[in-house]
Amino acid sequence: MEFSGTPQEWNAYIAGQPHAQFLQSYEWGVFQKSLGRRVWYLGGGEQKESVRCLAIAYPLKGTMFYLMCPRGPVGVPSDVWSKEFIKWSHEQGAQFARIEPIESVPMKATHVRDVEPSHTRIVDLSKTENELLSVMHPKTRYNIHLSQKKGVIVAAKKYNEITSDELAMWWALSSETAKRNKISVHSREYYQKLLTSFPYITLYQAKWQGSVVAMAVMVGFGDTMYYLYGASTQEHKEVMAPYLLQWQAMVDAKNVGYRYYDFWGVAPDDSSTHPLAGVTRFKKGFGGEVITYPGTFDIPFKKLPYILYTLLRHVKRSL
């Protein structure tokens, strides 16, 4: 069941899937290892029947752990391989298995709160720039042009070009944004490792009169450019820098051959109470189509430890 090929062979398969999932890339496993987690590369089948699953172990209390396949398994038939992953997870001694299937859901799975967003908005970059602009909300187009007139400058750097000062600026802006919007963020160490080691990262920054007013972390993998994280300051918000930053990232992605631009999470049906409600209106203005995945599912092997885990998670979130 464990994959015996090369990293290049792994990525060739994952990146070759429609709307390729970077969370199943070989390098995402390497990044998870750098965080101290155990990972496995699982695979089976030939050609059209081939399936891949990057499995990550997340620690629980003591020596207990659960195994997760983020945004996967990938391939056809994924429902059959979801069952294989669940069986394998049980054999490894996991307390439960967690999957985020692309399509169908195995029986006896418990639908839980999303880890990765189950609703997202995707823009088809095969259209011309004028066509992309024409399907945007008029206010979004206006803000893009306004930002250009105000003199906002957008620049991008690959993961191996990002400086320590830019990392510090990202942390400052993301912390400010999280506090303003009352959302949680990863640790500073997490961002530092991600931005400087994951090879599909591009860090965008928008400057106005020499000051950084907005930044965004993009991930380009396979046929898709993902807008993973965004941050901005309230100062000089009148120059509408995040709008021009997004537009420039879309144009850049189109010009280097990406087919899709994924906004990585929106609220379902524009729900006003969803955690992503605050950014959904902004993302919706750029057009595109809403795509819905089944969600995140747990398959517990031992009921009591799983019940205790869910209770502790609920208490922690309510504090």
Description of each model-found segment:
Residues 37-39, 91-94, 255-258:
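Short, high-confidence coil segments that cap the C-terminus of an alpha-helix
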Residues 103-153, 265-319:
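Terminal substrate-recognition subdomain of acyl/acetyltransferases
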Residues 83-86, 192, 196-307:
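Aromatic (often tryptophan-rich) hydrophobic motifs at membrane interfaces
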Residues 70-107:
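A gly/proline- and charged-residue-enriched helix-loop-helix capping module
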Residues 61-70:
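N-terminal cap/recognition module
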Residues 2-62, 101-106, 111-123, 127-238:
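A conserved beta-strand-loop-helix scaffold within acyl/acetyltransferase catalytic domains
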